[in-house]
């Protein structure tokens, strides 16, 4: 049986370690040595995956989780997964447009903090997943608002954080590429994945990014705000014109012995309004409406 995974998770199910060709107990001194070495690698931004084995008799049935116990730690693999070149400018552009960026990752605190430092994201306090497991919804909502970086998260942790942010009235977009991101992708208002993501992430996402550059996120935000602003213009113009027509006919009919406008006249007016509204989708939008997200407010009518 060969198992691989996050270092701490593998260490929890190992009782021995292969050292200089011999199998020795995984005692506290050895455990401390392993953790010191891997923490040094994490601080350098290297992700660490542990590998363990166990000899089991052959069987015809499936292997189960209970078999993952008393394993032998064979070693660990450290690899660098650098951020995309466009990550830093994309984060800066999103912040300038009023988008708050939060990092929800299954990586260790040290690796995640190192990557955030490289892309210029100020994270402050790092919250690991085990700290949010026993929090209530209100406590988690308050924590999610003030925290930028969550590390060592399970798929359910990510989903909970996205859900509480939505409950607080935020519009949440979640970008994920792995199978662990699928629950959060479904829970978000807008699930975003990339063309090279795993199948389950692409299926759970609402939008698939075909371009490699993350600057497409800023372009999408700006274009979406332009579309939303022009939709509001159309709704306000249509509602005000139709209300004016109907209200004037109702009031005039109450005091005049004749109809001030025939149905044909109303249809002609609507046609004229509709022709003028053809230009609204390509109308210019003010900078303040682009830089800050707008909300639909019926009172504006």
Language-model-derived ranges and their functions:
Residues 185:
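Cytosolic ligand/metal-binding cores
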Residues 123-174, 178, 188, 193-301:
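Membrane-embedded transport module
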